[in-house]
Each structure stands twice: as structure tokens, then as C-alpha cells.
Amino acid sequence: MIDVIIPVYKGARETRRCIESVLGSRQRALFAIVVVDDASPDREIVGYLDELEARGQIALERNERNLGFVRSVNRGMTLHPDRDVVLLNSDTEVANDWLDRLQRSALSQPDIGTVTPFSNNATICSYPFEGWTAGMPGTLGLAALDALFASANPGRTVDLPTGVGFCMYIRRACLVEVGAFDAERFGRGYGEENDFCLRAAAAGWRSVLAADVFVFHQGAVSFSEERAAQTQIATSTLLDLHPGYVRRVREFIVRDPLGAFRAAVDSARHASGADEARHVLAERTEERAHLVARLAEIEQMRQGLSHAEALVAERDEEIVKLRSALGHAESLAIRRGAQLERIHASWLGKLAIYLARTKS
């Protein structure tokens, strides 16, 4: 039995489409949909969830007050301590036997702890390329595109530096050993799955991509200043806890072990018709532009670092000069102090002689 855990707060339309897609997909695996209502202020969402619960289609957990994404997820994961779980964002959509394929990947090796699928909006697990966030690629639609992933990359997995939390299968044995998400450090919902996967890796568990599954992810429409600030804080916390994280992700992107699996789906789409082939070519052109922009950004950062290094060297030289001057001043002060002591002693001696003569 698997618990598909969907934390819900806002976004009535997205939430409805997400849950309906899970209900509409047929699986061999037994599963339950666990919705955690994080004190949603949206009456449409509240009413919709009540209806689903009354029909026995979901298990509904309601927070009395808003606890945030991470604590809501943790609540869902503790409900049934004998079950594997899938964390599914409420702005995602699934198709076909998506859960069966995720489970097959999760159980394919005893040390696999988490499994993440491909998506249009999943950072390092994005398709058609890392960095793509422009919605559903092509014209086939979710079900047909997911079916192409299943046929192009059947049963294939790739090790990841971290899972991605929009849709992540977690083995119960891994969860028991590693523990829940860190709500104290990542309570706002940024970086918690990365921290979990890195803690799991330290305990010997692997995070993998299921290359034969595609899940649609709406994602944030706009990157607000508040979200940017929260992400920056979470990233700083993550790096304090796991100093090698950024290097591992960077090395993964440079190696691009997902490239062959993306290319296999590209070929299948290209063969499906001229219209889809044009979209594939357009995406490849956009990917090249994306890479050029990234290279320009990296070069700008490199130049900035070079300038910073030059400033540091200049400041170091000033510090050396200042220390030398301070050392000279200290030496001078010591010499002046010794001279003053000698003068003081001389005057005291003269004063003693004078007083002796006066008394006589």
C-alpha cells in the first residue's frame, strides 16, 4: 500500500486537476490519496475536499491552523508507518500507470530511497532540458507524452544528487532510518527535500530518476521577492549543513547523465509527426540559447570573481603595509618608553641628590 500525500492550501483549479488526475489513473499498486488541508482559506477548496472525503475517494487531514508545507507533509507521512509514500504537489498532474512505474523503480534496488520522475518544471529533472519552465512541451498532451517516456526509457533509472520534491517517492525503510523532513530549519518549504536526500545519502540510500515517467508541474507563475528571499535563506542553511551540495549538483549538470534519455524521447516525438518534430527542433534551439545565456552568466560571475580577487589582493597588500607600520610604531613606542624610563630615572636621581644637599 502506498500513500499519495497531497498538501493543499490555495489554488482551487490546480488542486482539482491534480486530484482528478490521480483518481483517473489506473494502477496495479494499491494506494490511498491522503490530502492534508493546511487550513486553506479558499472555501471552494474546502467544499471540494469535503465532497471527496464523503464519497470515500480521499483520506482528509485538516490542520487547525496553517502549519506550512513541511509540517503538513510530515503529518501525512506519519499516518501509516508501514507504507511507502509519494509526495505530490497540488499543482501537478499525472497520467497512465505513473505510480506503478515509480514503485517499480523504487523497488528495483534495495538501496534506492527516493525516486523522482521527469517533468516540465523540475530543475535538474526537467524535460526537454534542465532549466525549462515553459509549460507542457509540444502538442501531444500529458497522457501521450508520458506514454512516450514509458516506451522510450522502460525501467531505466539514473542516480541523482538529490530528489525533487514536486513528486517524490520515498521508501518507508529510508524514511524510518533518516527521519522526517526538518521543519525547524526548512519550515517554509524550500530545501527540505534536498536536505532529506542528502541525509539519506549519508546513510547509504540513493536518490534516482525514473526515466520512464513524466509528470506535469505547473510551478510558481512568478518568482516573488519573498520567495527569492526564502530560497536564499534555505540555500544558505542547506550549504551550512551540506557544504558539498552545490558542487555535486554542478558536476551532475555538466555530466548530463539524463541527456540520452531526453534524446530518446525527442526521437520518439520527432517520429510522431511533422508538427511535433517542429516543436522538438524549436526546443533544441531554445536549449542552445539557454546554454549560451548560462555561459554568459558564468563568464560574468568569473569576471566578478577575478575583480573580487584583485580587490582582496589589493586589500591584503594594504593590510601588510598597515601591519608593518603598526609594528614600526610599536617598536618606536617601546624605544620611546625605554628612553622615558631612563629620563625619569635620571631626574629621580638628580632630585634625590638635590634633596640630600638641601637637608645638609
Language-model segments: residues:
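A conserved hydrophobic helix/loop-capping motif in glycosyltransferases and polysaccharide synthases
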Residues: 2-14, 18, 25-26, 36, ...
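Glycine-rich, basic loop-to-helix element that forms the pyrophosphate-binding segment
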Residues: 63-80, 96
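Short aromatic/hydrophobic "clamp" motif used to bind/position activated sugar donors
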Residues: 85
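Conserved donor NDP-sugar-binding/catalytic core segment of glycosyltransferases
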Residues: 93-134
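A short, conserved alpha-helix in the catalytic core of glycosyltransferases
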Residues: 97-103, 159-179, 184-216
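Boundary detector for helix-to-coil junctions that initiate low-complexity/charged tails
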Residues: 244, 251-360
